[in-house]
């Protein structure tokens, strides 16, 4: 297992912690590939009946893609990058056992999308989450598709086109968060849900989850190719590179 992920067992539940707190648990190649491998292995382990995803530290579940890494990307990197990102989301979707996200902080971009691929989401009123890709010069393609499974079109358009994050309170009101609890109770609530769902028949659980995947699989497959086309055009325009450069410079100034 890579150093960017921690694993804990709680009876029949496995807790996966994204462990890059110094960069708000941003997704780089190592974290992504480790997560894909780990989820695939856990799906084959009959002793594991539920999975809880969370992040290290008290600031972020996952802030999205590691901007230091993708600042070096060009249009030629889009195919391989997005193919592997899609594989990460698929690894979450393809779990035949319950997958619950326990939000310990902000969830943005790819981190938000991981959460949307899970079965249940537990958060707290003050947290922030959303789809800020457009502020980084990137088209919101995968995120806007995943939100269609949770939101009406009007709110989806608003979040995708403004890039603004919403509070946990609002996310619960519009149906993104399944459970809203005080911050200190998020993990306990998530583990309780996982324990209860672990007691249900694993065959019925697998078949029910497979049915939900079948209902949404055509769109999930199509969105990868749509995202590749859109992000190649975005990168060819130079907008992502410029937006990311400005963000990284501003971040460096704040740290200096």
Name the predicted role of every residue range:
Residues 1-19, 164-198, 206-216, 242-256:
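Amphipathic alpha-helical segments at domain termini/boundaries
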Residues 1-54, 90:
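Conserved CoA-thioester-binding segment of acyl-CoA-metabolizing enzymes
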Residues 4, 55-91, 219:
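Glycine- (often His-adjacent) and acidic-residue-rich active-site loop
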Residues 13-17, 52-54, 74, 100-102, ...:
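Structural motif
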Residues 30-34, 84, 91, 189, ...:
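Charged catalytic carboxylate motif
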Residues 91-203, 237, 242:
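Crotonase-fold acyl-CoA enzyme core
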Residues 159-160, 211-214, 230-235:
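Helix-loop "lid/cap" segments that line or gate small-molecule binding pockets
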